[in-house]
Amino acid sequence: YYLSTKKIPVVYMQNSGIGNAINPLMSLTDKEVYNIPLLLLIGWRGEPSIKDEPQHIKQGKVTIPLLESMGIKYAIMSQSETELATQLQFAQDYMNTTKESFAFVIRKGTFDNYNFSQKNSADWCLSREAAIQIVASTLNKKDIIVSTTGMISRELFEYRETMCQGHERDFLTVGSMGHASQIALSIALQNRQKRIYCFDGDGSALMHMGSLAIIGTMHPNNYIHVIFNNGAHDSVGGQPTVGLNINFPKIAEGCGYEYVFSVSDKKSLCEILNRIDRKSVV
């Protein structure tokens, strides 16, 4: 955006995304490389002394030190409109003068609640939660599940609790978004005698799509990759993904998955689960 317009772009992220951003911030936009200014709006999960989920605690502690280590000037966004106006003017002047990035770290509760005018309104015949329950109910006692971050892991956990089942065969990837499929792959390669299921989401699959190529190339015959595609990041407000605009089955086929199925209703899902060739990557 900056290269084509010379206008300063705004990049919004949760602080868990800083890790993914470090490389381009240091090797591309930094003043010692191309000196491209960005206005970073960073949601502060896991702020010290503020109760949050376990996966956010460490990231919350190091959010400010990371910005300082990268040499990125920052401010904690004020909840006072007058003070915020001063902060914004300072940030604008700083970026225009130095061509360096500036970050606003945003505490929980800084903004009022907002109702989206448009929401993901797909008319699902089968909810994600119901689909998770159906697949989980077909597994035998030796099968292992690696579930992705967000609602999928939460709903799998709740299903186990409701059914009075243990959690010892489930690895809930509560953080590390996009990496569940590779965790499952490694487990599958080291445990050939067991079937390994990856319960993935469209958002996490999109985040690291190169993982599909690695899985297809490694071709473990005990790996079953299930992508629950609802076209939204449900656990962080329901923001839409492009999951409903692309063809996951074709992508999987192109990456070397031997058997690929797509279903959208309970009957079809049950039929496919009964047909799956357990000896091939799916």
Language-model features: locations:
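Short hydrophobic alpha-helices that are characteristic scaffold elements of the AMP-binding
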Residues: L3-S4
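Glycine/aspartate-rich loop-and-adjacent alpha/beta segment that forms the canonical ThDP
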Residues: A21-P24, L28, P48, E100-K141, ...
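C-terminal binding/interaction regions
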Residues: S49, T63-P65, A75
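Thiamine diphosphate
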Residues: I8, N35-L41, P48-Q59, E158-V282
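Active-site diphosphate/adenylate-binding microenvironment
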Residues: N115-M177
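Glycine-rich beta-alpha junction loops
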Residues: R45-G46, I106-D112, T149-S153, N230-A232
